Amino acid sequence: MYIGELASLTGATPKAIRHYEKLGLLPVAKRKGNYRIYEEIDVQSVKMIRLAQAVGFSLSELYDLSALKYKNNRFPVEVAQQLIQKKNQQIIEQKKALNRLQEDLKQLEDEIIQTYITHKIPA
């Protein structure tokens, strides 16, 4: 299939697909003249890349996973699970950091109210 059909099947743009190929997330496509030719495995790869990006993975985080998939001609489920667990831990840490920030904002608000109301300092 040509790049336009791959784009249509995956929701990715041809530009994004060429970018994935340039980064090594997709193997260099076979050619028929000047046209890139893709296979069904590429459809699944682009779908996986787009879904992974949607849940917070960067393209660089997906490189090893994609490389293993094409090298072994099978999806490395164990590696994917490790990446997902690592991303989940990062999200937990981000949530903790956001909660601390929210607490700090509340403390700042309380201090401002206390200072300006108690001491009747003009704003």
Please describe what each predicted stretch is.
Residues 6, 13-16:
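Short glycine/proline-centered loop/turn elements that form peptide/ligand docking sites
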